[in-house]
């Protein structure tokens, strides 16, 4: 440091150096803070994307399809089998509930009771009771016929098994309706069979219409032979006709008119008549 510098110059140099270092530090800090903010935004966006409840559109569609066409559960299959052996109970008091009917038939192993109500929710005075076997249903009918239940004598009749239409209507929608894959496979099989049939028919037609080289050579030879025979016949006829004309001229005899000349004369006469 020079001794000739004044105190003010020394202070200004130190101040400028401090400001320069401080500005560089602040610039690097700003760059670091910008980078950290970008990194934080990227991590946050990726986290929100990965933690979204819907991983893809197919998952949502699959849930909707399952809701629209529920699978046949074990309970539903059991219920369909349970509807085979049942009795109809009529003349029930309007206060009779499902638990009352179950307690009445408990000795005959009932597995299901269906109370019949109208649209207003009022009892129709009847219910259907289903059993494990047909023997249990018959025993319950014989034993509990005309039993008094809450002041009313019940009437029990054997319930006929459901018809085919009822079984199909009670069947879940997913069991009745074929899946998309099966329909698409059937459509693919039909189209492939049609294509196969069309290909085979076209191949048969092409095989029937195809002509080999030997057949072509044979046809050409036949045509050449027929043409040669025709030319030979015409040459012989002209040779036979020429000497006869020459002999007639030598003998000063009239030449017999040919068929062509006669035909020409007839045509001329017809034209003159017209």
From Swiss-Prot:
The segments labelled Disordered in the record are 1-63, 148-217, 230-274
Q: Which SUPFAM superfamilies match?
A: RNA-binding domain, RBD (SSF54928)
Please list the residue ranges that the record marks as compositionally biased, kind Low complexity: 181-190, 200-211
Ranges of biased composition (kind: Polar residues): 148-160, 230-245
InterPro entries reported for this sequence: ALYREF_mRNA_export, FoP_C, Nucleotide-bd_a/b_plait_sf, RBD_domain_sf, RRM_dom
Instruction: List the GO molecular function terms.
Output: mRNA binding
Statement: the UniProt record of this protein carries the keyword RNA-binding: yes
Where is the sequence biased in composition, kind Acidic residues? 263-274
Where composition is biased (Basic and acidic residues), the residues are 1-20, 45-63
Segments of skewed composition (Basic residues): 21-44
Pfam families, alphabetized: FoP_duplication (PF13865), RRM_1 (PF00076)
- Coiled-coil stretches: none
List keywords of the entry alphabetically. RNA-binding
Q: Does the keyword RNA-binding apply?
A: yes
- RRM domain location: 85-161
| Any one GO CC term of the record | nucleolus
Name a biological process GO annotation. poly(A)+ mRNA export from nucleus
Note the SS bond partners.
none
The family database entries (SMART domains) matched by this protein are listed as:
RRM
Q: Which PANTHER family match?
A: RNA AND EXPORT FACTOR BINDING PROTEIN (PTHR19965), THO COMPLEX SUBUNIT 4 (PTHR19965:SF82)
**What is the name attached to this protein's record?**
Uncharacterized RNA-binding protein C106.12c
**Organism source for this protein?**
Schizosaccharomyces pombe (strain 972 / ATCC 24843) (Fission yeast)
């Amino acid at each position: 440091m020079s001794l000739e510098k004044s105190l003010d110059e020394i202070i200004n140099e130190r101040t400028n150096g401090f400001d320069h270092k401080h500005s560089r530090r602040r610039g690097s800090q700003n760059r670091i803070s910008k980078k950290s903010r970008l990194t934080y935004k990227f991590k946050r966006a990726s986290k929100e994307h990965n933690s979204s409840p819907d991983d893809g559109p197919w998952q949502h569609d699959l849930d909707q399809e399952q809701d629209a066409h529920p699978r046949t559960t074990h309970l539903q299959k059991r219920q369909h089998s349970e509807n085979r052996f049942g009795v109809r109970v009529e003349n029930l008091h309007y206060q009779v509930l499902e638990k009352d009917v179950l307690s009445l038939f408990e000795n005959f192993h009932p597995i299901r009771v269906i109370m019949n109500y109208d649209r207003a929710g009022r009892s129709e005075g009847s219910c259907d009771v289903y059993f494990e076997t047909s023997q249990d249903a018959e025993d319950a009918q014989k034993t509990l016929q005309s039993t008094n239940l809450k002041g009313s004598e019940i009437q029990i009749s054997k319930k006929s098994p459901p018809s085919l239409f009822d079984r199909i209507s009670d069947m879940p929608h997913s069991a009745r309706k074929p899946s998309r894959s099966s329909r698409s496979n059937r459509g693919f099989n039909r189209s492939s069979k049609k294509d196969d049939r069309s290909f085979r028919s076209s191949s048969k037609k092409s095989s029937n219409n195809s002509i080999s080289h030997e057949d072509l050579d044979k046809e050409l030879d036949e045509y050449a032979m027929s043409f040669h025979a025709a030319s030979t016949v015409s040459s012989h006829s002209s040779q036979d006709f020429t000497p006869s004309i020459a002999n007639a001229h030598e003998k000063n005899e009239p030449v017999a008119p040919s068929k062509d000349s006669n035909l020409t004369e007839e045509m001329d006469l017809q034209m003159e008549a017209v």
